[in-house]
A protein has these predicted regions:
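Surface-exposed, charge/polar-rich loops and edge strands
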Residues: 52-65, 74-78, 87-137
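N-terminal active-site beta-alpha-beta segment that forms phosphate/nucleotide-binding
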Residues: 1-61
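Short glycine-rich anion-binding loops that position phosphate/pyrophosphate groups of nucleotides
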Residues: 1, 70-72
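A structured binding-face within diverse protein domains that lines the active/interaction site
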Residues: 48, 68-70
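Short, conserved beta-strand edge motifs with alternating hydrophobic and charged residues
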Residues: 18-21, 67, 105
Length: 137
């Protein structure tokens, strides 16, 4: 989304990067290995996503997931866009044998004292803003 903090520089330093795409058939996020330059606007929201034919990435092979959001708290709470894609992805990854770290990426102005949380909402492991990195684990 245009008003989110841009993780492009962070991605540029990664050795290997998996990006999410919305799997509309299964109503979930799927992760594929791709280069940042190869992402193209796709789907109803025109989000930059990898080619659906790109090699799938397994949770066991991913070390860190950058998670977008509208707002965050100092406890790792996150307010997303209401579709639950990241909450379901985080829950699925954490149910496996080895899950990556899930870290929010935002502007400091998006960090609030409190957010409404529901039973299905997943807390993040950390948060990166222009003020630095906070770990919640």
């Amino acid at each position: 989304m245009a008003d989110e903090a841009d993780p492009g520089e962070l991605v540029a330093h990664a050795r290997r990067t998996a990006f999410p795409r919305v799997d509309r058939e299964r109503d979930r996020l799927a992760w594929s290995w791709s280069e940042l330059a190869a992402l193209e606007p796709r789907g109803p929201w025109a989000l930059r996503e990898p080619d659906p034919k790109a090699a799938a990435a397994a949770w066991e092979d991913i070390q860190l997931v950058v998670v977008p959001g509208l707002a965050f708290t100092e406890r790792g709470d996150r307010l997303g866009y209401g579709k639950g894609y990241y909450d379901r992805a985080i829950a699925a990854a954490r149910s496996g044998t080895r899950a990556p770290r899930f870290v929010g990426f935002a502007f400091e102005a998006q960090v609030l004292p409190e957010l409404p949380m529901q039973a299905h909402d997943q807390r993040l492991d950390g948060l990166v803003t222009e003020a630095g990195l906070r770990w919640f684990i």
